[in-house]
Amino acid sequence: AMTSDCKYGFGTELTISFDETLSRVETLLKNRGFRIFTRLDLKEIVEGERIKDIGNYVILGACNSEFAKELFSADPDIGMLMPCNIVVYEPGNGKCRVMVKDPVRIMDLINNPLAIHAAMKVKDQMEIIIEELKQDDI
């Protein structure tokens, strides 16, 4: 199910393995014109400390050049909100969780119709990716 407990993002939990989920997310992003520019591993960020209940945890930073052109044209400061972050992690319940930052929620603060319009297109693509992931999870 689409997880609704997060106020600034959306996503799903899958039963497939972490590695399989990560590779599937990367493929689906690429299929929708998103390039992955950053890949952060939580282990590196927290210098090997264990965070209670969390297993593998990777943050992917992705951008779609078409949407990025629209966003930067609408507001050059938008770079602070880039890239689009997608997290893939093991929450400790035997599943794999995929969450996407909700670009529209964040753009609402900007109050620029062009930026909001571009953000809605990004969100549509991300929602499709989450749906595609759920369909794979038999």
Regions found by a protein language model. Give the residues of each.
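Terminal, regulation- and interaction-focused segments at domain boundaries
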Residues: 2-32, 131
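A generic structural signal for well-ordered coil/turn residues at beta-strand boundaries
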Residues: 4-8, 56, 82, 94
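Short glycine-/small-residue-rich flexible loop motifs, especially phosphate/cofactor-binding loops
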Residues: 26, 43, 127
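Compact, glycine-rich, soluble single-domain proteins
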Residues: 37, 41-84
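Beta-strand/loop substructures that line and gate deep hydrophobic ligand-binding cavities in soluble
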Residues: 85-111
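Well-ordered alpha/beta subsegment
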Residues: 109-138
